[in-house]
A protein has these predicted regions:
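All-alpha amphipathic helical-bundle segments outside canonical DNA-binding/catalytic cores
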Residues: 101-113
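Short amphipathic alpha-helical segments and their helix-coil junctions
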Residues: 37-39, 86-102, 147-148, 152
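Activation of the activation-loop gatekeeper triad in protein kinase-fold domains
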Residues: 40-46
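Regulatory N- and C-terminal appendages and interdomain linkers associated
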Residues: 119-162
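An alpha-helical support segment within catalytic cores of ATP-dependent transferases
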Residues: 1-21, 31-34, 92-99
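Active-site activation/catalytic loop segments of kinase-like enzymes and analogous catalytic loops
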Residues: 53-98, 112-130
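Catalytic-loop signature of eukaryotic-like protein kinases
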Residues: 26-29
């Protein structure tokens, strides 16, 4: 399934940049009164990679399963009233700022990141089982793994359709 599908369908452009690896709202410090970022935190898993991976990880609030990413989900939220752009507007702004015409095969990247997060959480579940987990709430990650993997497969199917 998905573990075989991802490498077989990785026809993404080879584009190497510095990537954060965990670029998401919980690792960004915003200015208290202005709409701008003051700092990006938590760089310990930064590496060289495809920046669209960071982008689609950052946007998981828009497309991830409602209760499984461990972060807020925008499903059913009036984003406009909160000043939060839609997924499409966010991607369009990214493309505008980076000089892109669009994102090729965005569903592949979304499937990859959902699968990646499911694998990370499964690793935490293993640490709970082995008694080596640091976080007292780590066991709750077990319930998140399957919905993430299922959502990843849905994105893989969308990637297949083009």
């Amino acid at each position: 399934a998905l573990i075989e599908w991802l490498p077989a369908h990785n026809n993404t452009p080879d584009e190497t940049r510095i990537v954060h690896g965990d670029y998401a709202p919980h690792n960004v410090m915003f200015h208290p009164t202005e709409p701008r970022v003051q700092a990006v935190l938590d760089w310990e898993i930064s590496t060289l990679g495809n920046p669209i991976g960071d982008l689609t990880y950052n946007t998981m609030n828009w497309y991830g399963p409602a209760t499984s990413t461990g972060r807020p989900n925008f499903s059913g939220v009036d984003l406009d009233s909160l000043g939060i752009p839609s997924f499409d507007d966010y991607i369009a702004k990214y493309c505008e700022r980076t000089g892109r015409d669009g994102i090729e095969n965005i569903h592949f990247y979304k499937a990859y990141n959902l699968f990646r997060l499911a694998a990370i959480l499964q690793g935490i579940v293993g640490r709970v089982r082995d008694g080596t987990a640091n976080d007292p709430n780590a066991a709750q990650n077990a319930a998140r793994v399957i919905p993430l993997a299922q959502r990843a497969w849905e994105e893989a199917q969308l990637a297949e359709k083009g």
